[in-house]
């Protein structure tokens, strides 16, 4: 246990050390300031603008939102066409056939919405073309879209009496060119150096040591997709077993690298926020609130997995190892599970269905908090900003003052947008789960009975309703109902809060700043951090406690004899 604690502390310290300079760099990218890559990338940027006919004129929230939706719609149609027609496309050495309409629809919605829910296994269902041209490209642009929208939201708080929130095409291009591509290139090369596969060769047939049997070894351009799947909080694995598969995550060192990649940009964006609003204490307050909840979750999962597993008298135990890779152990698996669900990533290096009841409760609850404990790149922070405004509003009601945040007064219109930001994901999750448990096809998809079977359904629809993408593997997802309903849920959960965030940004940008007074609520001290954590947890608890009581909590009590 001492080793696990040291590992977790080292991880958090290293994460913060890497995130601070990256956050400063991303702030310069956001405001268009020159960075050390400008000499190389500026000509590419200018050429790209000319090629696409991009105007750098600012956009209103409506135009920005329409641009996001139109761009995502084109990506959706393209990915769906590639998946259904992959049997006729190149880079298909194994002769993979096109996906069914419902599965292609679900997969396209999943990757366009940055969810990466997978109702298929990559090595048996998709060609190299589909993986690299279809899905990997969406991993880049869906992540860039989230960060671009965050840029617009931040501008809403730092601009005064403006009618625009920035230019989507410029934001999208700069995020992709200056942030995601360089980081992904570095990470992909590092992963390849550690044994992660990157090849367009045919699958290999090898003779095993046991009776000379033949075995097919899947290959493919995995490292390039894994790099952006982690950095962009996408999470969709090149192979079905995701980051538990040795070709994706071969060692404890690559496990550390991938966990850092999952949280690096979300944490750096908080640093960037503090720089952008000219008050680093604001960023530190948000970081502290997120980190406290994250650390509590890591501790809860680790203790549950280390001590709640089966024990045998006279036999030393290394914790509950069911569904875990020996090379990662309880510590590496627990930290990964917390990171991937706190950050809206969804990649897994262990089977979450095999976690102990309380160990599985924490990842589920992280998602049910709205993916704001670091959250997805961009979307996590603008979701947390929604909770901050709600917290300020509640505090204002308690003392009878007009609530303010960063010098901007909070008005009824702002609260309507905040309600859309916060309430849409839990409403979709609960409605989807309620309908699903009544469907015979979903009941047949569940491998377990009782409380754990309900947990599998609740986890699946929580994951889709909060754009995470991970799953309890005992849930067979490839049914027409789950594919179609899940796709609609993922799209609504992604784009309704996104559009609400943009309209919130424009309303804020149009206001003038008010000077802070002695009665202004401080949003950067310990009291506010505690209040913010309380609001985030309370909203999650009020929304999901009845469902959790029927699922993982009831499952926990069945372990007592």
From Swiss-Prot:
* One GO cellular component, as annotated: plasma membrane
Q: How does it sit in the membrane?
A: Multi-pass membrane protein
Q: Which GO terms describe its molecular function?
A: P-type potassium transmembrane transporter activity; potassium ion binding
Where does it live in the cell? Cell membrane
In Gene Ontology terms, what is a biological process of this protein? Answer: potassium ion transmembrane transport
Q: Which Pfam families is this protein grouped with?
A: KdpA
Transmembrane regions listed in the UniProt entry: 4-24, 65-85, 133-153, 177-197, 253-273, 285-305, 380-400, 417-437, 484-504, 528-548
Extract the coiled-coil ranges from the record: none
Keyword annotations for this protein?
Answer: Cell membrane, Ion transport, Membrane, Potassium, Potassium transport, Transmembrane, Transmembrane helix, Transport
Top-rank taxon of the source lineage equals Bacteria
Transport as UniProt keyword:
yes
Subunit and interaction comment: The system is composed of three essential subunits: KdpA, KdpB and KdpC.
Q: What does this protein do?
A: Part of the high-affinity ATP-driven potassium transport (or Kdp) system, which catalyzes the hydrolysis of ATP coupled with the electrogenic transport of potassium into the cytoplasm. This subunit binds the extracellular potassium ions and delivers the ions to the membrane domain of KdpB through an intramembrane tunnel.
Q: What is this protein called?
A: Potassium-transporting ATPase potassium-binding subunit
Write down the species.
Listeria monocytogenes serovar 1/2a (strain ATCC BAA-679 / EGD-e)
């Amino acid at each position: 246990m001492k080793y696990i604690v040291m590992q977790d502390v080292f991880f958090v310290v290293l994460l913060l050390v890497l995130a601070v300079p990256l956050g400063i760099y991303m702030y310069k990218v956001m405001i268009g300031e020159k960075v050390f890559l400008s000499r190389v990338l500026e000509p590419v940027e200018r050429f790209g603008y000319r090629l696409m006919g991009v105007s750098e004129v600012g956009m209103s929230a409506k135009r920005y939102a329409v641009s996001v939706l139109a761009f995502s719609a084109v990506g959706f149609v393209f990915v769906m066409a590639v998946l259904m027609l992959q049997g006729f496309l190149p880079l298909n050495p194994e002769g993979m056939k096109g996906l069914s309409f419902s599965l292609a629809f679900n997969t396209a919605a999943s990757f366009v919405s940055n969810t990466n829910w997978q109702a298929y296994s990559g090595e048996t269902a998709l060609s190299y073309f589909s993986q690299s041209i279809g899905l990997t490209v969406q991993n880049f642009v869906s992540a860039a879209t989230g960060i671009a929208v965050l840029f617009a939201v931040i501008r809403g708080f730092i601009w005064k009496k403006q009618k625009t929130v920035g230019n989507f095409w410029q934001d999208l291009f700069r995020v992709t060119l200056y942030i995601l591509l360089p980081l992904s290139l570095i990470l992909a090369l590092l992963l390849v150096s550690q044994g992660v596969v990157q090849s367009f060769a045919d699958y290999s047939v090898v003779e095993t040591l046991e009776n000379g049997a033949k075995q097919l070894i899947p290959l493919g351009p995995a490292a390039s997709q894994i790099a952006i799947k982690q950095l962009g909080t996408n999470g969709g694995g090149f192979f079905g077993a995701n980051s538990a598969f040795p070709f994706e995550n071969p060692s404890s060192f690559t496990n550390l690298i991938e966990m850092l990649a999952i949280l690096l940009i979300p944490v750096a964006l908080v640093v960037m926020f503090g720089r952008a609003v000219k008050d680093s204490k604001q960023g530190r307050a948000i970081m502290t609130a997120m980190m406290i909840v994250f650390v509590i979750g890591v501790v809860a999962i680790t203790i549950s997995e280390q001590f709640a597993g089966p024990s045998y008298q006279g036999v030393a135990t290394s914790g509950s190892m069911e569904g875990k890779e020996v090379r990662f152990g309880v510590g590496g698996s627990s930290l990964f599970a917390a990171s991937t669900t706190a950050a809206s990533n969804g990649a897994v290096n262990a089977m979450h269905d095999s976690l102990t009841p309380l160990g599985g409760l924490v990842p589920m609850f992280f998602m049910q908090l709205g993916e704001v404990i670091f959250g997805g790149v961009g979307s996590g922070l603008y979701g947390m900003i929604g909770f901050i405004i709600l917290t300020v509003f509640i505090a204002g009601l308690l003392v009878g003052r007009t609530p303010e945040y960063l010098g901007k007064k909070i008005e009824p219109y702002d609260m309507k947008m905040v309600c859309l930001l916060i309430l849409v994901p839990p409403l979709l999750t609960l409605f989807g789960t309620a309908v699903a448990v009544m469907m015979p096809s979903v009941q047949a998809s569940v491998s377990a009975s009782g409380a754990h079977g309900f947990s599998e359904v609740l986890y699946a629809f929580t994951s889709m309703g909060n754009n995470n993408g991970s799953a309890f593997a005992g849930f067979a997802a490839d049914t027409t109902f789950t594919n179609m309903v899940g796709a609609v849920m993922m799209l609504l959960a992604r784009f309704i809060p996104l559009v609400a965030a943009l309209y919130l940004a424009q309303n804020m940008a149009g206001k003038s700043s008010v000077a802070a007074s002695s009665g202004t609520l401080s949003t950067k001290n310990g009291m506010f951090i505690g209040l913010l954590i309380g609001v985030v947890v309370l909203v999650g608890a009020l929304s999901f406690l009845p469902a959790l009581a029927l699922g993982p909590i009831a499952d926990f009590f069945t372990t007592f004899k």
